Every structure is written in C-alpha cells, then in structure tokens.
C-alpha cells in the first residue's frame, strides 16, 4: 500500500461513519438515543442514553399509522418500472423483514415479562405494539402493491414469501431466538437468560441485521426513485427500531455495570450469534464464497456498516 493511502477496510469504515451521520439527520432518529448515531462521542464510549421513562415518552411522541400511507405509485413501480430479475432480488430483503417482524412480535412477550423492573416492562409493552404495526405495514404493502399475486391474508402471504429466505435466517430466528425465549418463558426469574435474550434480540437481530437492511433498502429506493409509500413507511419502521435498540443498549449497559456475570452473558451471546447473523445478511441467490451486490451495496460495504453500528453500541456498554 502506498504511503498516505487508506486500506480498503479503513475506507469502508470511513464510509460507514459518514453514512451513520447522514442517518442521524433524518427526522426523529437522533432523538432515539441510539449510540450508533451519536458519532465521535460513541466512538469514545460516551453517549447520551435515554432512561426507560424517557424512551416511553419518546414512543408517545413518535406515533404513526400504517393506514396513512399511499401505495398507489408503489404498485405502478413494482409492476411497470422494476424488472423481473430485480423484483426477484428485492424479495430477499422484503421477505426477511416481513417474516422477521412477525417472528420478533411473537417472541417479545416472555422477554418483556421477565425484565426486572416495571419501567422496563412498560417500555417493552410499547415495543410489542410497534412490532405488530410493522407486520401490518408489510402485509398492507404486499396486499395493495400485489407483491405476491394470488395470496389471501396475512398467514398466506407469510408462507408464500418464506421461500425467498436463506437457511441461516431460519437457524437464527426459529432456532436460536425461539429456544432462548422458550427457556425464558419457563424460567422468567433467570436474569442471565434475560440478558442473553436482549443481547440476541436488540443488539444482533435489530442492531446488526434490521438496521443494516433498512438503511440500504431505503437508500437504494430513494436513489432510483421507486416505492415512495414504502420508503415513507419503512423509514418510520427504522426510527422505531433505533428506539428499541436504544432500550437494549441502556438495559445492557446497566446490567454489565451491575454484575460481571451479565457482562459475560453478553459476550457469550455475541460470540454464539454473530457468525450466524453474518450469514443471514447474504442473499440466498449469491454463492457463499463470492462478493455480491444488493440494494446498491456490496457484501463488504454491507458487513462493514453492520460492524460499525455494533462497535459503537458495544463501546458504550463497555465491551469494546
């Protein structure tokens, strides 16, 4: 490498930092308290974290309704402006979010009930409502745009879109997450299990996977000028997710400071889940050992963005 030049890895990290700065400028995003959006302060391990009551109050101020979205132009775009091959490639992202939102809606209840304080449980009650709204958002988009013609109803659409997922998705959501939540439902007094579940749910599934996908899907549609109703709604979904991740960061920061056992639980869960989450990001139509591009971003760019987001949050928690 020539003196004065940056390595590709350093360049991708710099791009990720710039991207996070632009996301923070979206309306209401910085207010969520997600450390990933707090720039150099988070890089130094310092961030302004909202407490659980403040997160609840923010939820009250950031309400939105799926019925207010207009998908008229989206239907035209999907059937007339987006070609067959691109529609097929886009289905990976759409399916992962549609089914992912349904899965996390179903799994959050036991986590909420097992949280130690009433303030934490109240906030997670709002998150259950958010996740259900996200499922309704995707169901309405699929229905009114005609994403899967011939399907009838939510359950039918979920079954039909599942074929576009990769194997790692099922292993993470239906295997690892479901088993952790089942354990928690049986032993709600196990605080270590709560810490593990929130690490997997909020740090990995929402923080690494969901927000990475949301960023690139929204940005690509804005760049090419497609699906304006979807972009509007998905932006609101992303804002909700940043608020959820801010809760997870607050919770794990508090728990890591309280007991070394909880720090170890966070680290153990990350070590177990991140290799699988890494595979979830790869589209099923791409070979495992090759680079790919989806929604205008390469494999390396996508993974670098996810890593930068996680790094900032872990520094604030005190683990990086």
State what each model feature region is.
Residues 2-320:
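Non-heme di-metal
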